[in-house]
């Protein structure tokens, strides 16, 4: 997994094919490797109520483009954490990092060492999956929140293509039963969940169509590994949703003041 992301972040910044893909699918090229379009990012801002005076940490920030966009939208100071050195290096070259509005650090979601009461808002945009122990990770994220702090998670849960249909636990699909919901509950955290599955389905269809249109460009740039990864994601999500075995949610913890 780490090898893939090292290769991914070394190539996509300069890829015209991937930039076009992100623009057509997500509404803007933020070098997305995930499932969040501008609409979902807007909902994340709205539900967490990020203010210009606040400090936010983005867990799994990649090369920082999404953190930069969210900081531009809200005026807040963002710290991005990622475990890929190449991604962090590129993030530190962003204009916001140079003027002090953005900071980026290397870190592992399974070995978090964050300051207690260090942030007003914690964001996880399709990154909690990398945790090997959701309850422990949530506990550490909760500890880094200041009084009145909030957390926002864009999160998908469903059958992966390699899991037989009859072996996937359907009972974990409702919003109060997903692994993330169980981890939040185990930590005594109240939350709300917004169902984004219909949006996820439409975006998966768009991804497949756009990738088909751009296949030649990905091949010319010799980054078919990115094309194949994105196509596999889209196909897997479409199949799982059509089987009734996939959900996408926005989980919000705490209330903006």
How should these model regions be labeled?
Residues 121-133:
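A short SAM/SAH-binding and catalytic strip from SAM-dependent methyltransferases
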Residues 57-59, 63-111:
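Class I SAM-dependent methyltransferase SAM/SAH-binding core
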Residues 152-172:
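Short, glycine-/aromatic-enriched active-site segment of Class I SAM-dependent methyltransferases
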Residues 34-52:
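Conserved alpha-helix/loop element of class I SAM-dependent methyltransferases that forms part
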Residues 135-150:
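A short glycine-rich, Lys/Arg-flanked "PGG" loop and its adjoining helix->strand segment in the class I
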Residues 1-25:
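N-terminal, positively charged/glycine-rich alpha-helical extensions of SAM-dependent methyltransferases
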Residues 195-257:
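Conserved Class I S-adenosyl-L-methionine
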Residues 113-122:
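A short acidic, Gly/Pro-enriched loop at the edge of an enzyme's catalytic core
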């Amino acid at each position: 997994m780490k090898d893939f992301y090292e290769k991914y972040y070394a190539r996509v910044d300069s890829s015209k094919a991937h930039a076009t893909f992100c623009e057509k699918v997500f509404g803007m090229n933020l070098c997305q490797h995930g499932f969040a379009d501008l609409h979902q990012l807007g909902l994340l801002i709205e539900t967490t109520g990020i203010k210009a005076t606040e400090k936010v940490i983005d867990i799994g920030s990649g090369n920082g483009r999404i953190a930069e966009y969210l900081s531009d939208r809200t005026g807040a100071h963002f710290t991005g954490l990622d475990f890929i050195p190449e991604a962090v290096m590129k993030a530190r070259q962003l204009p916001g990092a140079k003027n002090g509005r953005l900071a980026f650090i290397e870190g592992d979601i399974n070995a978090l060492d964050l300051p207690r009461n260090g942030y007003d808002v914690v964001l996880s945009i399709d990154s909690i999956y990398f945790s090997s122990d959701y309850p422990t990770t949530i506990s550490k994220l909760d500890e880094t929140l200041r009084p009145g702090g909030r957390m926002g998670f864009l999160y998908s849960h469903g059958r992966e293509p390699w899991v037989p249909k009859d072996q996937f636990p359907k009972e974990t699909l409702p919003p109060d039963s997903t692994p993330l919901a169980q981890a939040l509950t185990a930590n005594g955290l109240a939350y709300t969940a917004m169902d984004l599955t219909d949006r996820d389905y439409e975006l998966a269809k768009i991804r497949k169509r756009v990738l088909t249109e751009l296949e030649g460009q990905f091949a010319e740039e010799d980054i078919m590994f990115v094309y194949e990864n994105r196509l596999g994601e889209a196909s897997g999500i479409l199949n799982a949703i059509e089987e009734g075995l996939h959900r996408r949610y926005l989980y919000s913890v705490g209330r903006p003041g």
